[in-house]
Amino acid sequence: MTDLYQQTCEVCRADAPRVPVDEAEVMLEEIPLWRIQQQEGVKQLARNFKFKNFIEALAFTNTVANLAEEEGHHPKLVLEWGSVEVVWWTHKIKGLHKNDFVMAAKTDKLYEG
């Protein structure tokens, strides 16, 4: 498999399949700091990123926002002093699509600098 961070998001339709559990487990190996959580019955990928201060956390939030605009896929972002929680899922299918794993990997690359 090509590294997830090198891939681009596919256009996702409402009838697109959710990622099967076995595929999700394989893709999670590339993004080991992410966790799958369930919110109101919807599976999501989530990770907390730590920063020295609010300004660094805000800058990262804006960088992720720019990536989201470029890829046409948008996360939930929770900004606090010294941390940003990023949560990816595909609204149209109410669950996880390959795009979410791609974007999680891209988010990791942004954080690594």
UniProtKB/Swiss-Prot annotation:
Keyword entries, A-Z: Lyase
Gene3D superfamilies linked to this entry: Transcriptional coactivator/pterin dehydratase
Keyword Lyase: yes
Record-stated family: Belongs to the pterin-4-alpha-carbinolamine dehydratase family.
Entries under SUPFAM superfamilies matching the protein: PCD-like
Pfam families given in the database record: Pterin_4a
UniProt EC number: 4.2.1.96
MF annotations from Gene Ontology: 4-alpha-hydroxytetrahydrobiopterin dehydratase activity
Name of the protein this chain belongs to: Putative pterin-4-alpha-carbinolamine dehydratase
Chemical reaction(s) catalysed: (4aS,6R)-4a-hydroxy-L-erythro-5,6,7,8-tetrahydrobiopterin = (6R)-L-erythro-6,7-dihydrobiopterin + H2O
HAMAP family: Pterin_4_alpha (MF_00434)
Record GO biological process: tetrahydrobiopterin biosynthetic process
Organism field: Saccharophagus degradans (strain 2-40 / ATCC 43961 / DSM 17024)
